[in-house]
């Protein structure tokens, strides 16, 4: 094991300090990751607690024909489940496709809630549905403790129209944005968990998100496992799992193939464990970016143990903006295998994701 440290001293005393452990113990067989392909069966209720109230969205008016708006049925089912004093499951049955507009699942709830997504949940394909709404949200959970989301089903962001409008794809939008005529708009994260504690998110497929697929922000004690996260390699900013300002997050036994970072970990996050991950295509596993706009940033105690990265732009990466302040420390990457990776290990302390050169802030 080698300890590698790097620091950047900037004008005005700004500094980002990075400490990372790079462990070159690479696995030699891809077969060790094959069990990840076989996720638990959809709709399995063998582990259902003995005493549990079941709320079925079909009983609240969800048609599941992929055309009718089922948002109200989902909202009503959530309100009932969240208000009950006993453990409750919301069931989204298999065999149906549910069209759901941007929706908030607000806590706190009176007891434990399990959301079992056994069918297919799809987003509106037209970005205009978000007019007047927060364009960064689609399925948004906030302030919920002891929540489990599982079920073997699929969450489909249908983000193709959003991708075509992205400034990374549509260069005309970049020019118009510079002229303040058509600013580049944010796109939704498919499913966001904000200020949730004791969260379990498992056994689901999340695909074709408008932008990021899964976001954990300001969360504590999270286990994300047995996930499949898929988007085309050309889809812009479609990070698989994005962890921000969260502590004690474990991501394991999952396959992530997207157009951006498979997993990204940004400021004020700590106690992050990542293991048994298949990544690629995509941009690898990233710490950052950190310190944009001269901000303070810190990430510490991150361990990546067991990953196979193939056909990715980067392998394991730490990226910080010039002018930023703070630190990234105790970062460990071990038992990582890479194939056809352009930049296997990269520490970039002058990160810039702008189409135009970034102004010198040092």
Language model features: what each stretch is:
Residues 2-362:
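Extracellular/periplasmic carbohydrate-active domains that bind, remodel
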């Amino acid at each position: 094991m080698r300890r590698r440290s790097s620091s950047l001293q900037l004008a005005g005393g700004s500094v980002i300090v990075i400490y990372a452990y790079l462990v070159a113990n690479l696995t030699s067989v891809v077969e060790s990751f094959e069990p990840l392909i076989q996720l638990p069966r959809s709709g399995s209720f063998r582990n259902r607690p003995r005493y549990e109230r079941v709320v079925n969205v079909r009983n609240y008016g969800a048609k599941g024909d992929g055309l009718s708006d089922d948002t109200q049925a989902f909202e009503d089912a959530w309100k009932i489940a969240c208000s009950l004093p006993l453990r409750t499951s919301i069931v989204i049955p298999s065999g149906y496709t549910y069209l759901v507009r941007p929706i908030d699942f607000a806590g706190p709830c009176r007891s434990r809630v399990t959301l079992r997504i056994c069918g297919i949940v799809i987003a509106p394909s037209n970005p205009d549905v978000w007019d007047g709404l927060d364009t960064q949200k689609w399925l948004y959970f906030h302030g919920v403790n002891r929540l489990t989301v599982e079920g073997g089903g699929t969450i489909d962001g249908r983000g193709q129209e959003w991708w075509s409008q992205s400034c990374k794809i549509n260069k005309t939008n970049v020019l118009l944005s510079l002229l303040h005529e058509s600013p580049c708009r944010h796109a939704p994260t498919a499913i966001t968990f904000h200020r949730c504690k004791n969260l379990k998110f498992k056994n689901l497929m999340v695909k074709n998100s408008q932008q990021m697929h899964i976001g954990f922000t300001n969360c504590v004690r999270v286990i994300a496992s047995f996930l499949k996260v898929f988007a085309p390699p050309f889809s812009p900013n479609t990070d698989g799992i994005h962890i921000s300002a969260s502590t004690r997050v474990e991501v394991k036994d999952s396959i992530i193939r997207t157009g951006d970072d498979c997993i990204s970990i940004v400021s004020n996050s700590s106690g992050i464990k990542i293991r048994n991950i298949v990544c690629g295509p995509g941009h690898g596993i990233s710490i950052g970016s950190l310190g944009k706009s001269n901000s303070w940033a810190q990430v510490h105690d991150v361990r990546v143990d067991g990953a196979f990265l193939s056909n990715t732009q980067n392998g394991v990466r730490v990226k910080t903006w010039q002018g930023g302040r703070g630190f990234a420390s105790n970062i460990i990457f071990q038992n990582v295998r890479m194939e056809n990776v352009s930049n296997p290990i990269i520490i970039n302390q002058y990160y810039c994701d702008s189409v135009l050169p970034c102004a010198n802030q040092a």
